[in-house]
From Swiss-Prot:
Any Pfam family matching the protein: Com_YlbF
Protein name as catalogued: UPF0342 protein SUB0718
SUPFAM superfamilies, per database record: YheA/YmcA-like
Family: Belongs to the UPF0342 family.
Chain coiled-coil ranges: none
Organism field: Streptococcus uberis (strain ATCC BAA-854 / 0140J)
Length: 112
């Protein structure tokens, strides 16, 4: 039985990789990597996201300057078609991820 659960998990992984939505995210990321402007904005976004996550974990809130940086970066993302396509594809894929997560963790609710 223990081995079986890992087999199911691996099947889910393979199924996710075969989803058209997953493939769209992969293709969108490849397009970003080919474009230096989009790639720079993309990298900047993930650095800022990590910084904000750390701040929140430490109970800090972004300063006015940091909030302005967030706003400017959001505008850059919205105006870049490659980045917009990537985040839209991510959003479509996240529907599956959220549903799968809900299904997997549903039995754990019984333990609380």
């Amino acid at each position: 039985m223990t081995q079986e659960i890992y087999e199911y998990a691996n099947k889910i992984e393979r199924a996710l990789r075969n989803l058209p939505e997953y493939k769209k995210v992969v293709a969108a990321k490849e397009d970003i990597e080919k474009d230096s402007e989009a790639s720079n904005i993309f990298e900047e976004f993930f650095k800022l996201q990590a910084k904000l996550k750390e701040m929140i974990q430490n109970g800090q809130t972004p300063s006015n300057e940091e909030q302005e940086t967030i706003h400017q970066l959001s505008s850059k993302i919205e105006s870049n078609e490659l980045l917009k396509a990537y985040f839209e594809a991510q959003q479509s894929l996240s529907v599956y991820i959220n549903d799968i997560e809900r299904i997997i963790f549903n039995p754990l609710k019984d333990l609380i």
